């Protein structure tokens, strides 16, 4: 799940869903990993993929038919999903405070967040390599 740990004002509150977010975080039957990383890493500005690449097209349309770098929140979540502990550390020494004031403690094996193992510049290079290279 993408969202901030302390009173996230975007991902966990969109569409007036704070109570739904609370229910999901409390009752989801498998481990949940929270990621709030990527806001300081801009990727995708040098897309060298083929013109029919869906990644290239998404960046192009997002920026009104031009190429610019974008914050990498989504890319961090995907990178964790496919590369996992090789690129991030799972931690549970914190808690989440939702906008409605509810506090949820992290629990090993159930509710974690990820912490970086590398510098933002290193993540930028990895993500750009994966999304910007030409198809082979």
Language-model segments: residues:
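N-terminal acidic, glycine/proline-rich low-complexity segments
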Residues: 1-136
């Amino acid at each position: 799940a993408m969202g901030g740990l302390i009173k996230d004002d975007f991902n966990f509150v969109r569409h007036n869903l704070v109570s739904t977010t609370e229910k999901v975080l409390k009752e989801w039957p498998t481990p949940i990993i929270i990621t709030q990383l990527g806001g300081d890493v801009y990727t995708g500005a040098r897309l060298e993929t083929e013109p029919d690449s869906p990644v290239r097209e998404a960046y192009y349309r997002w920026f009104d038919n031009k190429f610019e770098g974008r914050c990498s929140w989504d890319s961090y979540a995907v990178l964790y999903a496919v590369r996992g502990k090789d690129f991030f550390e799972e931690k549970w020494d914190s808690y989440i405070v939702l906008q409605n004031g509810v506090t949820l403690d992290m629990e090993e094996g159930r509710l974690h967040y990820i912490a970086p193992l590398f510098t933002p510049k290193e993540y930028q290079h990895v993500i750009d390599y994966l999304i910007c290279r030409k198809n082979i």
